[in-house]
A protein has these predicted regions:
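Sec-dependent signal peptide recognition
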Residues: 2-8
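Detector for intrinsically disordered, low-structure N-terminal pre-sequences
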Residues: 11, 24-26, 70
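C-terminal motif of bacterial Sec signal peptides marking the signal peptidase cleavage site
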Residues: 13-16
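Bacterial signal peptide processing site
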Residues: 18-21
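Edge beta-strand at a domain terminus
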Residues: 25-31, 93-98, 131-160
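Short, solvent-exposed loop/hinge segments that bridge or flank secondary-structure elements
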Residues: 32-79, 112-121, 143-158
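Short coil/turn motifs at secondary-structure junctions
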Residues: 49-51, 87, 129, 139-141
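Contiguous, well-ordered beta-strand patches that form the walls/edges
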Residues: 76-133
Length: 160
């Protein structure tokens, strides 16, 4: 009886702590996402914030950005196949960073071009349902600006 009670207590404790995307003995995890759920095409919309005074050339309120995220099993982006664009221009720009698969925390660097020291930083959270909420800072810390110095709130959705 004692060993059965101990076993049940251990099972309930493990299930309560389960936060991975994989189930534990049939008990589903929660809070995590998979690389497959993040990989795909994304659309982001920016809105200026008052955190930084925006300089000339900054993105406009409501401006859309698109990205192709190729996420590896450890959450890092495959830099050779991940990219972003500022429509309507067709220029494909490099993207690096990663997504914490345990909780969706996202930190991406959007470069002006390959080998450039001009970059923006996109930080926030991606959900398993295909949404993003966070902020965009131009320039990223230690980088030069891509468009014009500004800080934005960002909403995004996975489009495919």
């Amino acid at each position: 009886m004692r060993s059965t009670l101990l076993c049940l207590t251990l099972l309930v404790s493990l299930a309560a702590c389960e936060t991975s995307t994989d189930g534990l003995i049939g008990i589903p995890g929660g809070g995590g996402i998979t690389a497959a759920q993040v990989t795909g095409n994304w659309s982001f919309t920016v809105q200026r914030t008052s955190a930084l005074a925006c300089s000339s050339g900054s993105l406009a309120n409501g401006q859309g950005l698109t990205a192709r995220l190729e996420v590896l099993s450890d959450g890092t982006l495959a830099t050779g196949t991940s990219s972003w664009q500022n429509p309507p221009t067709a220029l494909v720009r490099p993207l690096s960073g990663g997504v914490a698969l345990a909780n969706g925390a996202t930190d991406l660097f959007m470069f002006a071009s390959a080998g450039s020291s001009s970059a923006m930083e996109l930080q926030g959270t991606i959900t398993a349902a295909g949404s993003f909420s966070g902020s965009l800072t131009d320039p990223a810390a230690g980088s030069f600006q891509v468009f014009g110095a500004c800080s934005y709130t960002v909403a995004g959705t996975k489009t495919s």
